[in-house]
């Protein structure tokens, strides 16, 4: 297993400089962040993500280290990695500010070509896939409960279904979503 560096930057400028010099060679890093009220200054998560996007990188898992300190994994974005609406909004901002590096622009080009750029558009817009809607049509209670959930809960179900790669997995997830919604369970995490 590759040992990844653990890096701490006070500012996004330092992070940008590191990525400028290392974005092609590094496999990933753990960035250290401190809470706003902590005695140690650190760049904010949002700043780190924006800089990462400039170079075709993305954030991933986070781990609390206690005492207002946390570690978050950042790495080059995989070609088939889907793009959230938030990250696409950041990209628009970064392009307007002329902050995008060519490696980040190349990542976007690949994503647009392979469909991962728009893969979450229906999820972000709350569009229920036809197969799930048919299942809801057979269970009015599940559908009514689903419609009463906050948009974030509905979106999490749509995302869960969207990420299924095989048809058999999609069918299992549809059945699970219907069962949970029928029981008025807003999230798979609260079972």
Positions of PLM-derived features:
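Charge-dense, helix-prone N-terminal extensions
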Residues: 1-191
């Amino acid at each position: 297993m590759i040992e990844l560096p653990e890096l701490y930057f006070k500012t996004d400028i330092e992070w940008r400089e590191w990525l400028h010099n290392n974005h092609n060679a590094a496999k990933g890093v753990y960035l250290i962040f401190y809470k706003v009220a902590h005695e140690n200054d650190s760049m904010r998560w949002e700043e780190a993500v924006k800089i990462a996007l400039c170079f075709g990188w993305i954030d991933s898992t986070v781990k609390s280290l206690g005492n207002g300190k946390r570690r978050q994994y950042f790495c080059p974005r995989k070609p088939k990695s889907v793009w959230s609406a938030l990250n696409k909004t950041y990209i628009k901002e970064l392009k307007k500010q002329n902050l995008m590096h060519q490696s980040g622009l190349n990542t976007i080009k690949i994503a647009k070509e392979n469909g991962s750029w728009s893969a979450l558009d229906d999820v972000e817009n709350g569009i229920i896939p036809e197969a799930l809607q048919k299942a809801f049509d057979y269970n009015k209670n599940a559908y009514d409960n689903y419609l009463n959930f906050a948009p974030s809960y509905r979106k999490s179900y749509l995302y869960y279904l969207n990420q299924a790669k095989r048809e058999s997995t999609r069918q299992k997830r549809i059945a699970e979503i219907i069962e949970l919604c029928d029981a008025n369970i807003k999230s798979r995490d609260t079972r």
